[in-house]
């Protein structure tokens, strides 16, 4: 297995990553993958995985190339699969097409693959190289990769606040702290997530739909994705007291709703896309995330109030903290960002490290990782 890469290798893998990104709103629970086939320095085929059950990126690129695939180098953003699932193995497809070399951005930690795809290629006499633009490939599939490695989804906690760290007026009024551009960005982030997590308190207070509103997408994304192709996230509602009712706006949008609680209730009054997810009383977030991982939830976008935000942080259940900051001051009577009732000493305050800072219209979008996850 070779690991020496040329400038052309980097160029074509970058294109494969750009193709893979086109699937980020549609592929879950599968990863987003792109593939480029190159022969004599020219692209002869390319493709990306669009949706679970449809052809994988390698198969799309091979179909695009036809007979020109023979003798080509395949650049793929994730190790080709080697098992029969909803579709045949991609490693086998590359072998049958007669490609001369395969370059993978990274190995696939999926236990069904995990080096078996590269071995299948090697056994067929096809040289391969791995770990080209690995960090970019990892960033593209944070949810899938975490679930494969730990059995749990990648959790992004979204918060919106004023310059003085407030999320709403004392009365609860919060529409809208941030501007139109930031709220449109939230729609994109919702669409990338497998599931959206909130609480019955939020449902009762705001009666939100918690769906992806395609009409708020930027024009370039609308041109790229028809409304019916964008995946709606599973709406997961923590509802320990069974307070959510069929009349709530959640059920006016036909996408799955999972009500998480410990007390069985009559689900026959709810639409058929709603189910109750029963967990033991006083369950913790580790158990919840493990159960969601078993249900093939790759990533979770959290939108809730200060209670859930604080609880997730205290239980170290947040992989990424995303804060939208509006250029407003709400005063000391306004509501705070998160509740951390057990925090008494400054030395014990959770530490986060800024990863990205982006201007979104008149607002800022800040992305943080927990300090314990940061590589030295």
Question: Could you say what each language-model-derived stretch is?
Answer:
Residues 341-376:
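Conserved histidine-centered catalytic loops in small-molecule metabolism enzymes
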Residues 109-112, 135-136, 204, 243-245, ...:
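Short gly/pro/ser/thr-enriched loop/turn and capping motifs at secondary-structure boundaries
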Residues 8-28, 147:
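Short, basic/aromatic recognition patches
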Residues 32-41, 159-160, 366:
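Short beta-strand scaffold segments in enzyme catalytic cores
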Residues 146, 157-163, 167-299, 307-310:
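Active-site ligand-binding patch in enzyme domains
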Residues 314-352:
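Flexible, gly/pro- and Lys/Arg-enriched active-site loops
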Residues 37-136, 263, 313:
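Zn2+-dependent cytidine deaminase-like catalytic core
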Residues 16, 34, 81, 121, ...:
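Residue-level signal for inorganic ion chemistry
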């Amino acid at each position: 297995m070779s690991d020496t890469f040329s400038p052309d290798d980097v160029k074509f893998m970058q294109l494969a990553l750009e193709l893979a990104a086109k699937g980020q709103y549609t592929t879950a629970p599968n990863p987003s993958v792109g593939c480029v086939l190159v022969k004599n320095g020219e692209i002869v085929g390319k493709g990306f995985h669009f949706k679970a059950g449809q052809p994988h990126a390698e198969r799309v690129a091979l179909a695009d190339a036809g007979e020109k695939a023979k003798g080509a180098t395949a650049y793929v953003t994730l190790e080709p699969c080697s098992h029969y699932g909803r579709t045949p193995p991609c490693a086998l497809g590359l072998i049958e097409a007669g490609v001369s070399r395969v370059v993978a951005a990274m190995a696939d930690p999926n236990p069904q693959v995990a080096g078996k795809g590269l071995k299948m290629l090697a056994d067929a006499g096809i040289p391969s190289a791995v770990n080209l633009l690995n960090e970019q490939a990892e960033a593209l599939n944070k949810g899938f990769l975490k679930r494969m490695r730990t059995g749990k989804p990648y959790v992004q906690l979204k918060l919106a606040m004023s310059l003085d760290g407030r999320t709403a007026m004392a009365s609860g009024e919060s529409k809208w702290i941030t501007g139109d551009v930031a709220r449109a960005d939230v729609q994109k982030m919702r669409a990338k997530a497998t599931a959206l997590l909130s609480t019955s308190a939020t449902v009762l207070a705001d009666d939100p739909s918690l769906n992806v509103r395609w009409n708020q997408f930027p024009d370039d994304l609308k041109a790229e994705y028809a409304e019916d192709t964008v995946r709606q996230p599973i709406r997961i509602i923590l509802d320990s007291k069974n307070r959510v009712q069929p009349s709530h706006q959640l059920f006016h949008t036909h996408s799955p709703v999972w009500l998480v609680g410990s007390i069985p209730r009559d689900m026959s009054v709810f639409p058929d896309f709603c189910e109750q997810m029963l967990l033991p009383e006083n369950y913790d977030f580790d158990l919840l995330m493990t159960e969601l991982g078993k249900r093939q939830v790759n990533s979770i976008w959290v939108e809730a109030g200060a209670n859930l935000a604080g609880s997730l942080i205290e239980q170290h259940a947040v992989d990424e903290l995303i804060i939208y900051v509006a250029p407003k001051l709400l005063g000391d009577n306004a509501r705070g960002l998160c509740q951390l009732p057990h925090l008494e000493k400054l030395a014990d305050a959770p530490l986060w490290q800024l990863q990205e800072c982006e201007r979104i219209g008149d607002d800022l979008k800040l992305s943080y990782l927990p300090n314990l996850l940061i590589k030295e």
